[in-house]
Amino acid sequence: MTKITLSPQNFRIQKQETTLLKEKSTEKNSLAKSILAVKNHFIELRSKLSERFISHKNTESSATHFHRGSASEGRAVLTNKVVKDFMLQTLNDIDIRGSASKDPAYASQTREAILSAVYSKNKDQCCNLLISKGINIAPFLQEIGEAAKNAGLPGTTKNDVFTPSGAGANPFITPLISSANSKYPRMFINQHQQASFKIYAEKIIMTEVAPLFNECAMPTPQQFQLILENIANKYIQNTP
């Protein structure tokens, strides 16, 4: 029988291969343990998030107004107050005054946007009335344009009529109305309620931004509103 004798070199190669196999096995075990640890971590995290979500939903439910009656036992009934409280919280989250205190440019843009929105609202209302009466609106536009210019609003002049560059809807109303409409859509089906919520949004926005006008040359939104109303009344009173 032939006896096979391994040379020292072959023995070293086999030993190295065995060592490599053991190292690979150890690496695989370590990797498996790491994957398991990560998996357990995500399971634990998901569980905690679920608990927080359930807790939040319970808190939200407890804050909802309930009406109990024979036809709707235990059914939550939304009220205007619930929607308005949500809109107020949304406005607080936007934090207009906080952002303005940190950024002078933001504060200036906010003041201009608010006064431009006041200008646009009054212009549209009065122009629609004057046009319906067949009255030329050019003199009215010239006068309120001059008032807007005197208020410090930037803009352009065309055909002797100054128009604020930021003329348009109040930019803060849309986020409030949109978020409330998304959360409570059935409360916005009625047009009367839509108008009511818009008026409320304008009111709380004006209250929020009022302090931004305390230390500037611009009139407050209320003062600018009065200036434009006086101009409009002069033309409206002359309508037949």
From Swiss-Prot:
Q: Where is this region: GEF catalytic domain?
A: 78-240
Q: According to the UniProt record, what happens if one changes Q109A?
A: 700-fold reduction in GEF activity
Q: Where is this region: Core-loop involved in conformational changes in complex with CDC42?
A: 166-169
**Any GO BP annotation:** actin cytoskeleton organization
- The segment annotated Interaction with InvB runs over 15-78
Q: What UniProt keywords are attached to this protein's entry? A: GTPase activation, Guanine-nucleotide releasing factor, Secreted, Virulence
Its UniProt miscellaneous note says: Encoded within a prophage region, which is only present in very few Salmonella isolates. SopE-expressing S.typhimurium strains are associated with severe epidemics.
Q: What does this protein do?
A: Activator for both CDC42 and RAC1 by directly engaging these Rho GTPases and acting as potent guanine nucleotide exchange factor (GEF). This activation results in actin cytoskeleton rearrangements and stimulates membrane ruffling, promoting bacterial entry into non-phagocytic cells. Also activates MAPK8, indicating that it is capable of stimulating signaling pathways that can lead to nuclear responses. Chaperone InvB is required for secretion and translocation of SopE.
- What family is it from? Belongs to the GEF (guanine exchange factor) SopE family.
What is the protein's given name? Guanine nucleotide exchange factor SopE
Which gene name belongs to this protein? sopE
